[in-house]
Amino acid sequence: MSGRFAVILAAGQGTRMKSKLYKVLHPVCGKPMVEHVVDQVSKLEFDKTAVIVGHGAEEVKKTLTEKIEFVMQPEQLGTGHAVKCAEHLLASQKGTTVVLCGDTPLITAATIKKLMDTHEANGAKATVLTAHAPDPTGYGRVIRGNQGQVEKIVEHKDASVDELAIAEVNTGTYCFDNEALFEALAEVKNENAQGEYYLPDVIGILRQKGETISAYQTDSLSETMGVNDRVALSQAEAAMRKRINEEWMRQGVTIIDPQTTYISADASIGQDTVLYPNTSIKGPSVIGEDCVIESGTEIASATLGRGVHVCSSVISNSVVADGSSIGPFAHIRPGSDVGENVRVGNFVELKKASIGTGSKVSHLTYVGDAEVGSDVNVGCGVVTVNYDGKNKHKTIIKDGAFVGSGSNLIAPVEIGERAFVAAGSTITDDVPSQALSIARSRQVNKDNYVKKDV
């Protein structure tokens, strides 16, 4: 019985990135490059997926949680050597093997499937994913025979002047008959400018044996882009951002200026939501339908319900329920839970705070480590004083309470249901339900305190 296998090459050090971070772990739209590739592969029915790792292997293993197998390439001796490291997993298997690069984050499942379909339809032993490159510098060239058949692939550094003029390039993605692949790998030599074992040499070896070699030429060179330095990383980021934004617009999201709008690969956005220019949706954020996200807003790994309005604010690792309004210039820090129809206004900071339905925290307020009930009014300049220099303490404000402007609530403290705190109070003890608490000195006016002749 024939199987389908995938090998993802992710062992390169990536010295041109000039980074301490392992190359394939550099993010594109918030997700590591290699994870983009694995996600696309996982959409197809492969019996086994192997990721070849070397430098930073443990970090790659931590990043990828799919059911895949990791193969160590102890020395980076070329792409042919990398695939050969998976011999113990695949060599005895009948079927088709797709080889992809872990630094090609734009590759899609649709293109991989077309490559495999072409391979199987032609009864080929190897099929190369190729593309037309206006500037083929750095790419391996696809050399074809008189009948248009693929004869071999020549790396840029080893190409002749005539071969360098060829614009059809090897993208680094292949489909092989699995048994033929590993038989040919045993014959690959490292007699080249780099002294490495090149996977493309398998094409020439199979062709010399009279085997059928085919090619599938994609019309999207950008999809096959390999990322080797920060310039290419920025180009991949721009292409992925464009793809993501256009997909959300097709699904009913209004993006006023796609060029200045960032949406992570893991985000989800509901229909009829409007994103203004200079907005950033990071991580696995979920934004409901009919929301308005105005300029200058950053939403990071947060969940927004339906009809939420956010203006020039930051919301991180928190939940905002239906119909609530945030900002301008509010900061919703991790662990906060904002209920339905809540108003969190300008220059308000929440941290590990829950705000009940219909409550208002409108101006210049800090609410941290707090539980605020429903229909509560928190006045301007209120501070929950939660830190004693060593430990954090909780403030509880129950349903219907009113906290006057300029009040300090010294935690741990509880404000009872429908209780009132007078403006300017410093509350150190619990306030009973329906009570009025005034915790400030009486006003004393000193007549003639300032002499008239001063």
Swiss-Prot record:
Catalyzes the last two sequential reactions in the de novo biosynthetic pathway for UDP-N-acetylglucosamine (UDP-GlcNAc). The C-terminal domain catalyzes the transfer of acetyl group from acetyl coenzyme A to glucosamine-1-phosphate (GlcN-1-P) to produce N-acetylglucosamine-1-phosphate (GlcNAc-1-P), which is converted into UDP-GlcNAc by the transfer of uridine 5-monophosphate (from uridine 5-triphosphate), a reaction catalyzed by the N-terminal domain. Its cofactor is Mg(2+). Keywords: Acyltransferase, Cell shape, Cell wall biogenesis/degradation, Cytoplasm, Magnesium, Metal-binding, Multifunctional enzyme, Nucleotidyltransferase, Peptidoglycan synthesis, Repeat, Transferase. Homotrimer. One of its GO terms (biological process) is regulation of cell shape. Binds 1 Mg(2+) ion per subunit. It holds the Pfam family Hexapep. One of its GO terms (molecular function) is glucosamine-1-phosphate N-acetyltransferase activity. In the N-terminal section; belongs to the N-acetylglucosamine-1-phosphate uridyltransferase family. Acetyl-CoA binds at N386, Y387, S405, A423, R440. Pathway: Nucleotide-sugar biosynthesis; UDP-N-acetyl-alpha-D-glucosamine biosynthesis; N-acetyl-alpha-D-glucosamine 1-phosphate from alpha-D-glucosamine 6-phosphate (route II): step 2/2; Nucleotide-sugar biosynthesis; UDP-N-acetyl-alpha-D-glucosamine biosynthesis; UDP-N-acetyl-alpha-D-glucosamine from N-acetyl-alpha-D-glucosamine 1-phosphate: step 1/1; Bacterial outer membrane biogenesis; LPS lipid A biosynthesis. Residues 231-251 are annotated as: Linker. The active site is at H363. Residues 252-454 are annotated as: N-acetyltransferase. It comes from Shouchella clausii (strain KSM-K16). Residues 1-230 are annotated as: Pyrophosphorylase. InterPro entries: Bifunctional_GlmU, GlmU-like, GlmU_C_LbH, Hexapep, Hexapep_transf_CS, NTP_transferase_dom, Nucleotide-diphossugar_trans, Trimer_LpxA-like_sf. It is an enzyme of class 2 (transferase). It catalyses: alpha-D-glucosamine 1-phosphate + acetyl-CoA = N-acetyl-alpha-D-glucosamine 1-phosphate + CoA + H(+); N-acetyl-alpha-D-glucosamine 1-phosphate + UTP + H(+) = UDP-N-acetyl-alpha-D-glucosamine + diphosphate. Its EC number is 2.7.7.23, 2.3.1.157. It is found in: Cytoplasm. This is Bifunctional protein GlmU. The lineage of its organism: Bacteria, Bacillati, Bacillota, Bacilli, Bacillales. UDP-N-acetyl-alpha-D-glucosamine binds at residues 9-12, 23, 73, 78-79, 140, 155, 170, 228, 333, 351, 366, 377. Mg(2+) binds at D103, N228. GO terms for cellular component: cytoplasm; membrane.
